[in-house]
Regions:
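Transmembrane beta-barrel domains of Gram-negative outer membranes and organellar outer membranes
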Residues: 27-264
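Cleavable N-terminal export/targeting peptides
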Residues: 1-33
Length: 264
């Protein structure tokens, strides 16, 4: 399939999910809980018949082998509740542009991932609130940003409310990826985040995230230290920002994101 066709197909899927938004009228009047801006996902789902959009702009800066690169993208997550404890998910980094010193500019569309999230249990009697996420990244992007085949991942998000308006989130996981020559390999995923509710509408967090834990032959471990804030404009709308600093040479030196999320 031509590389220009698949991004159009992804856009069609986004539009199709948006058409489901009117069904949100049958759901309860619950507030927004997002999966951004931190790496660790929320254990909660959006609720039956609810549609949630989480979109952003992301700028990354890196210097590797003497080449300075800046990459800009538009990470977006669409979530639709098909039940009280289950949601469908569509996620992509969207339009991606990289300026790499004397090597010129590379632009195109990132791959799209399809997934589900299952809210397993609420927090109670010392037990965390738990959610399970199963995603599959599809080789659907432009040639420059396209991965190799279907790459599945499984993550478990656990959250605890702590004294002093603090919260703790932990997310271990595993995934399967492919090298450029098609070789399959497995990798680990891990993140831990500590949040603080500053006011009823403001929260802040610090986080250590490892989206990929792998052998050096398979790209090595990618790890960041993150900090950010989120501001609830209303029960259904949130603004957020996050700064991420790379913890090793395999990770972009720095990244900054600004996001907007709303629930219908």
């Amino acid at each position: 399939m031509p590389s220009t066709t698949l991004p159009r197909l992804a856009n069609t899927c986004l539009a199709s999910l948006a058409l489901l938004a009117p069904l949100s009228a049958i759901a309860g009047d619950d507030g927004i809980v997002t999966d951004r801006p931190d790496f660790v996902e929320s254990s909660n789902v959006v609720g039956r018949g609810r549609f949630q959009i989480e979109t952003s702009v992301l700028a990354e800066r890196d210097k590797s082998d003497g080449v300075r690169a800046r990459t800009y993208s538009m990470p977006t997550l669409l979530r639709y509740g098909v039940g009280d404890v289950l949601e469908l998910r569509l996620e992509t980094d969207g339009r991606t542009v990289q300026h790499a010193g004397g090597e010129g500019t590379t632009a195109g569309y990132a791959d799209t991932a399809l997934g589900v999230k299952w809210h397993v249990q609420d927090e109670a009697a010392g037990r965390p609130s738990v959610g399970v996420l199963l995603h599959a990244d599809l080789d659907s992007g432009s040639r420059a940003w396209r991965g190799q085949g279907v790459r599945p991942s499984l993550r478990v998000a656990a959250e605890w409310e702590l004294p002093g308006d603090l919260s703790l989130g932990v997310m271990p996981g595993i995934g399967r990826e492919r090298t450029e020559d098609g070789k399959r390999y497995g990798y680990g995923i891990f993140g831990v985040v500590l949040g603080k509710e500053l006011t009823p509408t403001w929260r802040a967090f610090v986080e250590v995230a490892a989206p990929q834990i792998a052998r050096s032959a398979n790209g090595g471990t990618v790890a960041t230290f993150d900090t950010g804030m989120a501001w609830l404009l209303s029960d259904r709308c949130q603004l957020d920002t996050m700064l991420a600093l790379g913890l090793n040479r395999r990770t972009p030196d720095a990244a900054l994101t600004f996001g907007l999320s709303f629930k219908l």
